[in-house]
Each structure stands twice: as structure tokens, then as C-alpha cells.
Regions:
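Extracellular/periplasmic metallocenter environments
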Residues: 104-119, 133
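C-terminal motif of bacterial Sec signal peptides marking the signal peptidase cleavage site
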Residues: 13-16
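N-terminal pre-ligand scaffold of iron-sulfur
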Residues: 20-97, 110-111, 123-138
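Sec-dependent N-terminal signal peptides
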Residues: 7-8
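Short cysteine clusters
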Residues: 82, 102-104
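Positively charged n-region of N-terminal signal peptides that target proteins for export
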Residues: 1-4
Length: 138
């Protein structure tokens, strides 16, 4: 009985593990390493202190970042490149409320989930919050 319990727990452990490197594979978007700190006390980013607000940060990722406040002290950071388009003049997304809009195909992606009903969701990056500083990295 103990062997079966051990086997069941071990199986659940290995099934629950995932490699975040594999979950962000997208043939349209290269994988660049970066790390940026966003200071919420700066006027450009102060709107991120409020739920459901988003800002565009142009200097990281493939086409910049879209940073979104999900519930007060939790944030999502997505690449601003359209995830289902080759890189082109129209593939930088814009913020439209709680969605990101791809100008190429007019598809919208939810900034809470990154989903847009297409084969690839938004490319999501890691986020750490320490006080009024948001660190976003890949």
C-alpha cells in the first residue's frame, strides 16, 4: 500500500512539473533575454497602480512590453508583438482597454489571460513585484 501511495504522489509531482522555456515557444517570435525594472512612482507608469490598467514599455522584448495590473499587486507582462503574425510594420500591438489589439489581423488578446482564440497566446514574461518596483525578465 505504501508503494502505491508513493508511486501516486511521485507521478503527480512529475506530471505537475513544467518547463516554462517550452511553454513560450512560438515560431513567429524570437526569444530575447532581458531584464527591466519599472518604477511605479514615475508618472509614465503610475497608472499601473490601479487594477485593469495597462502601459506600453518600448525598450524590451521583441516589440516592447504590455504590462497589465491584474488585481492590485499582481501583474502580467506580455510581448507587444502579435503572436500569430510574422514580424512586420503592423505587428506591434496596441492597448485597447483590457485587451491588446493586433493591427495586422484585428485580433484581440485578453490581458488577464493572454488568450485570443488563435493558435498562439501572447508571449508572457516573468514578473516580480518588490514595493513600487516591477521587475520583468526573460
Amino acid at each position: 500500500m505504501k508503494k502505491h501511495l508513493f508511486l501516486a504522489i511521485t507521478s503527480l509531482f512529475f506530471l505537475g512539473c513544467s518547463n516554462s522555456e517550452n511553454s513560450n515557444k512560438n515560431p513567429y517570435l524570437p526569444n530575447y533575454s532581458f531584464s527591466v525594472d519599472i518604477n511605479l512612482n514615475l508618472p509614465t507608469y503610475s497608472t499601473l497602480k490601479y487594477v485593469s490598467n495597462a502601459v506600453y514599455y518600448p525598450n524590451a522584448g521583441v516589440r516592447g512590453l504590455i504590462i497589465f495590473n491584474t488585481n492590485g499587486n499582481s501583474y502580467n507582462a506580455f510581448d507587444a508583438a502579435c503572436p500569430n503574425q510574422d514580424l512586420s510594420d503592423c505587428s506591434t500591438m496596441t492597448i485597447k482597454g483590457i485587451n491588446a489589439l493586433c493591427a495586422c489581423d484585428k485580433k484581440e488578446y485578453n490581458l488577464f489571460t493572454g488568450q485570443g482564440g488563435m493558435p498562439y497566446p501572447l508571449k508572457q514574461y516573468r514578473v516580480e513585484v518588490k514595493g513600487d518596483i516591477i521587475r520583468i525578465y526573460n
